[in-house]
Every structure is written in C-alpha cells, then in structure tokens.
C-alpha cells in the first residue's frame, strides 16, 4: 500500500517550486526526480543528494530524497529526511507548497507506524 502511494506521488509532481536567485541557479529542487529511472536509483540518489546539498533548507528537497530512499529500502534514512523536513515546515509553514505538506504528512504517519 505504501509503495503504491509513493509511486502515485511520482506521477503527481505538479507542485510549484520557487526559484530564489541566491541559491544555485544550476541545481533546482525538481532535478532530484527529473529523468528518474527505477533501474538506476543509486544515480538518482546521487543527484538528489546534490539537490539537498544546494536546497537542504527546503522541505521539498528532503521529501523527494525520502521517496528515493524508501524505494531503495533505506527506510530509516527516509524517515530521518521526513523528520527534518517536518521540522523545516514547522519553522515556516506559510510558504510551504500544500502538496509538499500533504506528502510529508503521509510519509510521517508511515514512519510513525514503523516505530
């Protein structure tokens, strides 16, 4: 069931992304999931790590990486990203994309069920 929710989230990636000029113009948050090949998740994770390095203060970057980590079976790391992203949301929820908030709430509940 969780896998279905996660894969559904991949198809529904229509959330908006702010493009601040001060943050790397070369790497956008959307790069994490661009050209995703489920047979090359290690390569996707490497790209996603670069996105998080550039945009680690944005919950969307951590949400995307948590999805990849979950697909790779690295649930503890995925839940750590979810926890960090939720903390960022609590700091500034006014500017958060509602889709990101929803995704993180679903993943957070899933992580809590494992404990």
What are these language model-derived features?
Residues 11-15:
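Bacterial signal peptide processing site
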């Amino acid at each position: 069931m969780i896998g279905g929710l996660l894969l559904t989230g991949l198809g529904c990636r229509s959330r908006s992304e702010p493009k601040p000029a001060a943050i790397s113009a070369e790497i956008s948050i959307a790069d994490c999931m661009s050209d995703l090949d489920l047979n090359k998740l290690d390569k996707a994770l490497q790209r996603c790590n670069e996105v998080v390095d550039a945009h680690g203060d944005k919950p969307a970057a951590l949400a995307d990486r948590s999805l990849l980590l979950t697909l790779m079976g690295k649930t503890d790391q995925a839940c750590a990203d979810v926890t960090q992203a939720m903390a960022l949301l609590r700091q500034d929820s006014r500017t958060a994309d509602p889709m990101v908030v929803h995704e993180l709430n679903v993943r957070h509940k899933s992580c809590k069920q494992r404990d």
